[in-house]
């Protein structure tokens, strides 16, 4: 009986080991190394799906949790040095039912060699009833934190990469799931759009979907759709 139990336990061990191996094989791997030393960074630039030029603005609207939500993204005429890299400041202003819920100042730089846009962190003000309540989600690519990739200069379906690399604070990552989508919003109709799925190991069950149009940028963020774009006057 003892020998039989030993064989049973051994079989279970092998089974668990094989399952673990199969699980590891199926786990998605996201790139977190981008050879930034080969980049000459600029605070302005653009690629097919992202415009990093002062004054450029996107406005998206829609309903989230049955509440009217508005997101205004503006490339500011401001820069900020993060580490030894001068970055461009991009403000995101989100409101729900006309009340501001979040204002973030995001720091991006353009790699002239690859046309990729890299993300160097953000400062965040979260609001409730018109008052700042916390700065949750804020991080900078300094110390143990590293810059992430916001938009590849040559995106390919299946490419997986980290957008934020701040362990325990911000670890958003993206997978390009399609290039060639068609979408229509009140601002226009577009073809050959880029679709990505965003996840984070900090909240494994959460998923978000975004779409980018050639020559425009972000046109869909969850339930929010582009209603206005161009250079703000």
Regions from the PLM with identified roles:
Residues 22-233:
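Conserved functional acidic sites
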């Amino acid at each position: 009986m003892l020998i039989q139990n030993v064989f049973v336990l051994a079989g279970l061990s092998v089974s668990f080991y094989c399952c673990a191996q199969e699980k590891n094989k199926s786990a998605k791997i996201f790139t977190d190394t981008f050879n930034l030393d080969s980049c000459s960074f600029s605070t302005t630039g653009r690629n097919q799906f992202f415009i990093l030029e002062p004054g450029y603005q996107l406005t998206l609207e829609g309903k989230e949790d049955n509440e009217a939500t508005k997101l205004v993204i503006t490339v500011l005429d401001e820069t900020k040095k993060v580490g030894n890299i001068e970055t461009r400041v991009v403000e995101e202003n989100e409101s729900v039912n006309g009340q501001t819920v979040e204002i973030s100042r995001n720091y991006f730089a353009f790699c002239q060699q690859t046309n990729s846009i890299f993300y160097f962190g953000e400062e965040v003000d979260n609001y409730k009833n018109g008052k700042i309540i916390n700065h949750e989600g804020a991080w900078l690519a300094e110390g143990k934190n590293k810059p992430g990739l916001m938009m590849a200069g040559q995106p390919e379906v299946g490419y997986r990469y980290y957008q934020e690399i701040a362990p325990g604070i911000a670890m958003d990552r993206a997978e390009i799931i399609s290039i060639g989508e068609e979408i229509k919003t009140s601002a226009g109709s577009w073809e050959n759009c880029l679709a990505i799925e965003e996840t984070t190991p900090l909240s494994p069950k959460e998923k978000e979907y975004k779409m980018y149009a050639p020559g425009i940028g972000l046109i869909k963020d969850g339930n929010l759709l582009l209603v206005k774009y161009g250079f703000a006057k």
